[in-house]
Amino acid sequence: MFPALYVYWLFPGALILLAYWVFAQWQKRHTASALTLTQAILFAISSIVFIVWINLWHYEQFILAFAALAVTSICLFMLYLTYPLTENKMNGRLPISIAFAAIAFLAFLTIGFLFISNNLIDFGLSRQLWAVVLLTCAAALALAIRFHRYDAAFPAVFIWFLIGVAIANNFNELLVTTAALFLSGVLIVGIIFIRKRLPANANKKRL
């Protein structure tokens, strides 16, 4: 269920977007749309814990690394929720959305890695079926974000990863490749056709 190596080039891109986001927040620091204390704390925690994750993964402390990745995902999700539903801009929610999506999918991949490395694959399901289950859960999360948060960027990142999974398997594992392509198609349809009327408070910024 692991993607082709090219997909990981998304992470340097996400870091560049976050660097621009930080610069944009600095420019807005004296305006009404300035970063709140809650947002600053959540971003700082997620950044620090992600650095910790890099070190834990490097030293093969995989379970602790997953815990750090989970904390990073939670902090980014909480930061993501502080933004209005309509603020899909480069200096607003968009960089956070892309970073959150990349970290969330990385968490799903880490779960799969832990299952394989610790021989936890059981319950009568093959490795391929477990991969399909995890990919389906990932796609369900992306669709939920698309529907409830009016966000096309989040599922787009998941499509990038899912296509990478299909390319990496190259039809050697037909079930996983087919599932990855099918779920990519579902997410594309979701991005294009999912429409829901914005609530009255859609432009309200949370603390």
Task: Tell what function each PLM region has.
Residues 1-10, 92-97, 120-130:
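Short aromatic-rich membrane-water interface segments that cap or initiate transmembrane helices
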Residues 42-54, 68-80, 93-112:
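Alpha-helical transmembrane segments of multi-pass integral membrane proteins
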Residues 70-81, 136-139, 162-164, 183-192:
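Alpha-helical transmembrane segments and their membrane-interface exit regions
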Residues 75-84, 105-117, 132-149:
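Alpha-helical transmembrane segments in multipass membrane proteins, preferentially the mid-helix core
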